[in-house]
Amino acid sequence: MTPHQTLDFDSCYRAASARDMRFDGRFYTAVTSTGIYCRPICPARTPARRNVRFYRHAAAAEAAGFRPCRRCRPELSPGDPGWDVAADLVGRALRLIDDGVADEYGVAGLAQRLHVTERHLLRLFTARLGAGPLAVARTRRLLLAKQLLTETALPITDVAFAAGFGSVRQFNATMKEAYGFAPSELRTSNGPLAAARRAPAPRAAGHAAPETRHSAGPAADRDAQSTRPGDAQGARPGDAQDARLGDAQGVRLATAAEPPAALTLRLNHRAPYDAATLLGFLAARAIPGMEEASPSGYRRAVTGGSITLTPADGHVKLSVTLDDTRHLAKIVSRCRRLLDLDADPVAIADALGATTLRALVATRPGLRVPGAFDGFELAVRAVVGQQVSVAGARTLLGRIVARAGTPARPTPPGGGIARPTPPTDATERSTPPTDMTTRSTPPADATQWSTPSAGGAGADGPFLLFPTAERLAEADLSGLGLTGRRVATLKALAEKTAAGELDLDAGADPAETAARLMEIPGIGPWTTGYIVMRALRDPDAWPDGDLGLRRAMRALDIAEDDVERWRPWRAYAAMHLWSSE
């Protein structure tokens, strides 16, 4: 099922009846007799066919008057990977909405980023999703708020701003109008304290209550709700105000006397999930002072705090500490892309498993392509990593961050701004220069966080941010071990990005970005392919000319012609080949 296909009722009903995990996030099941919508994997009894409607996107279900199920929790659905394969304008727009562009700049700003008119964007969204971009952004805010209310004890004020609302009043009114209950009511019945109260009363064996789909939760979720009128986008009165967030009044920012907000969220994914290989990849490339990784998890500094990502049963646990919760929505979106949580491993394995990669696919089920937390950061990593080892690139990047990076918080724990001591040139020269993509990862039995001798992380974890394009364009990069040509390439990359001539964000057009990258002296097909693969999330990107890929293909007796047979999953084929070494 691709985003361009019309939903077939019989196919969707069979998938929902079987609770087929492969369709989670690809469509939603709405029930007219209850007025709520579910994921295809909802564990309750399948409703009668006459009462069922299917929608491509949660926003379309909400625009038709349905509320999210409190049992299967649609806010936990992984994203639809079909949009990455299609690589079209709607998919790029969805990624920008996830990053909060519509919240901050409205639909006009979103359309401007995509170089189309608002009318054209609305027409595409309505045709493909059944709801306009404004409605999609609104649903994203509501579902994130629902997850925060259910999983955390974050104050409702902080929940409002973390989800992207401009005020608590707006948050209360929108949730009441869309879902039929106030935020405080949801927390009372479904929040962490309510769950704790319910936990000590298990039902005796043989006395389980019968399940009926959509019957969980209070009466508000059991009563049918009539379809609410909306405009062509499925938007509601007041959505225009929701679409732009100025300086939110009443937002609480952490101060030196008040610790930053700490919370934990579930990030669901489709099984299987090869966390070990992905974390090993990130650990080998962890930049000193900015990030740390081990086989048990990953953490890094972010604006106003830090994040920790830990694999768990069926999901990844995201632990966040932030000065300002308004950054949370973008962080969640970027973490999902970094860990490739929206991929469909079964579909990828079915396609690649029918080729010469059959043995590799069977060896590493659920292999993911590591993404990027920031597009510009990934581009710099790729340029610095040209013709040097992974360890050498990591050393050079650590020096760049130590010189040009900024603290995640104005005053880190302990006072002052302690920067990592850049390694000596001898450290870099001790590692033989080979292709960066072919280096081995840390041993599987390692259990400690990767903490380079360069320092900078300390007991409180990483606290330096990667320099922005504007900052790197002005930074002095001499004396760091970079060649003059490499410095010139980095400066040109930073200047073009800072000037808006080069878009490296998730919503960029891969083909257009690749063409602009190739215009920069010092950036060739390998660097471009690597950036498009990881920063722009193109599942068919191929780092042409990579020595490690050639070596692996020769060792496995795979012909060059086979590369074309791996479409549209060549990025995953590359990861399988790199991992085979």
Regions found by a protein language model. Give the residues of each.
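HhH-family (HhH-GPD) DNA N-glycosylase catalytic core used in base-excision repair
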Residues: 1-223, 229, 244-245, 249-581
